[in-house]
Amino acid sequence: GEKIYEDFNLSATPGQIIGVTGAVACGKSTLGKTFLCEYPYEGRICFHGKELSGMTKAEQNGMVGYLGHDPELFNDSVRNNILLGDDDDPEKYLKAVCFDGEVAEMEEGMDTIVGNGGVRLSGGQAQRLALARTLCHKRPVLILDDPFSALDRKTEEEVFANLRKLAADSIVILLSHRLYLFPEMDQVLWMEDGKVTAGTHEQILEKFPEYARLYEAQADGAEAHSTQEGGPDHAEK
């Protein structure tokens, strides 16, 4: 098949959050799914010196956690969607994603049934519930595909700060078209014209005019309109 990108090098350590962005249809989601071995690749993807493609499926699942931009929620309670049968405290993860207040106001609380795919929740609520589950079952590497796309900026900032604390022992690869928080990323990957360039936010800002244009437009408050129905959620406190 045709190559989507080439000449891509990245080294990361636990505790780092790496922001990945680029123009529309640049291959962000494909890059994320490459870490799930859903796409063939040339070269090596190594964790602790072990090649990803050489691991068993169980080893891969134990190494990489993935949250897609379409939350996969079950027709079950808020609690069970987070815990998936584990013995843990779901409240901690609801607080981390700024969803605890809204759940507390629901008539059935954590026992509220969310419907297949979270149809009984708003887009932002479903997104935060799926992120809470991902954090409850976190892996050494977490791939998060546009996890904040349905959130307002204030909630996004709070959830990001909590993510850094809860995932301090993981490598987080955050794919996003929203760049508010990219100055806080430990590394930024910019995808353009089939190439992926790694650097700090400042380095990418200086080197790539399109990245600078997108970042400055959003920093000035000219955020691109969400394509999701209903627009960004405003989390209740």
Regions found by a protein language model. Give the residues of each.
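ABC ATPase nucleotide-binding domain helical subdomain, centered on the C-loop/LSGGQ "ABC signature"
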Residues: R44-C46, R79-N116, F160-A161, D169
